[in-house]
């Protein structure tokens, strides 16, 4: 049976750490790892798990998102004495009473407290993308470490996950709810084959997948990221790739297209890619590789036109078509530049560039304790370390950190989009519980969460000359996940700061000692340092180049990846944090904070669409963007009666309320940039929570509280017997076109919305 271990408990039981390869800044606070124990679990436990797996499989085409049941079952067993308050429902014609809301809130927080980790964070599923596991399987296969690193049970659960998320037509999407793409289909088909699955396995699912691939043009039509993965594996030729010259890293930084000016996720993915391309690395050609060469193409492998394949992309994948200028650049590099740099004397410069690239790879690895910024560059960096030296310490240091990314639920084992969302979820959870004015009843929960947030702050900048490594300051920031990950993010810093400021208002006997004042000042310094000239805030760093650079975005599947753009979410979070800080510390950098908030609020108004909406880039979508837009403007001092932006925003949200009450927004809103309801106009508890919070902040209860009453009824009636809330459609998004799971949102936002509703609507004078 699988068991989730958290924090320091992950280390002694980790067989991959036999040589002491794991390091940590804070004794692994926030680390979450699943271990398999063959002797663990009663027959009843195993039957319950099997039932959950079967139920998911039976309904996988209607309900594509797991409910994180394995984790919940484990916590339920650990809290077997837990008995919640009786459930309550509100009938259609019945008024929503304070008693009904209060009981729903207590039931919700009671339950949510039972699934909190011992270190204070809330573990959960951060999966969703379908192109992550293949990179891991391919890397481990090439390095010969597949069976040594992934046990039979790991491999079985990965196969379960891939089969469960295969679409009816035989293909796989970019993410769990998406239609089939060549990128998803080829990589997941290859993964199953590398894991030992044959054509007849999965009740014919493997053969069905191959048919989808061939019916849609074969693997030559895979996207550029897919071409790269297939090339290193040996089932696609490097001649069929557009160039990724490592010499870009040797160019002067003043050039607007220098990699150091790119969004950090973009540059950290293309950094190892250009190393592998520059070396034209190909893994061992084994019998399975020879077989895949025959299985994936419409013509014999030696007859594929690789030059033509460079720019081929299946129509199902084409979200961002290459502009003509890009095709001209790639053709010039491919036909003129690359032949020169593969020969002496220019090859000497190539070797120098490759050395430079590896220095940056090692810097990233060492400063994230080999977690890396995300799962794509994690496995690519690991592969590069092996290519550089198969016996290197760097490669061995990578191995135990693989498990930081693996998560298991009733749908199988997935690779998460980060090493978790620990800090982000915990900061939101604190604010949600505090909004209820019931905080003193949940002192233990808040104390643990407070400790997690304090333990997760980044206490030092990265070593060395930050400018040389293209890094922003980190000291005082909060990361998205753990301190060991360590990459600083503007909105995570803001939400972390908001949470500790709220908790500082409660007695230390209840929630523990407040964070040191200097650490709060450091967080404020990070936030102020991240404001761009347009007044907005980007994610990890300042915006370092120009939007026209997006013309060179080579990833056909994703939008807005080349530079770190400014976002309503990051800007709003910064405003809220600085305003909250100023109330408690009015004398610290007051003028700077006032100027920053004023510019940021103007930015939020300037990017509002004419219909009153804000596009949410990190959540689905206009309800999410609207929540941040409204909340930021209100924090900055705007009011409904003196701000047309707020009036338009409220009108927009109210126009999207469903006839049944509540809001339900499909992921298609983000992809197509047009507000789209969930199928059958069903409400979603998370969208409903965001819309409620927005309208309450904008004073809707003073004008007409009816939509809020309807929404509250939806949330109350959605609560389950045990106090949990149901997992509904996927609610996270990145790069316009890919969705990601935020499993904690189903608990956080009903609590937060009903908390604000109870205190600011029902208890309003």
Swiss-Prot record:
Pfam families: SQHop_cyclase_C, SQHop_cyclase_N. Its EC number is 5.4.99.8. The keyword Isomerase applies. GO terms for biological process: triterpenoid biosynthetic process. The active site is at 491 (proton donor). Keywords: Isomerase, Repeat. GO terms for cellular component: lipid droplet. PFTB repeats lie at residues 155-196, 520-565, 597-637, 646-687. Disulfide bonds: none annotated. It catalyses: (S)-2,3-epoxysqualene = cycloartenol. It comes from the Eukaryota. One of its GO terms (molecular function) is cycloartenol synthase activity. InterPro entries: SQ_cyclase_C, SQ_cyclase_N, Squalene_cyclase, Terpene_synthase_CS, Terpenoid_cyclase/PrenylTrfase. The keyword Isomerase applies. Belongs to the terpene cyclase/mutase family. NCBIfam families: squalene_cyclas. In cultured cells, CAS1 mRNA expression is high between days 4 and 8 and decreases at later growth stages. PANTHER family: TERPENE CYCLASE/MUTASE FAMILY MEMBER, TERPENE CYCLASE_MUTASE FAMILY MEMBER. Oxidosqualene cyclase involved in the biosynthesis of cycloartenol. This is Cycloartenol synthase.
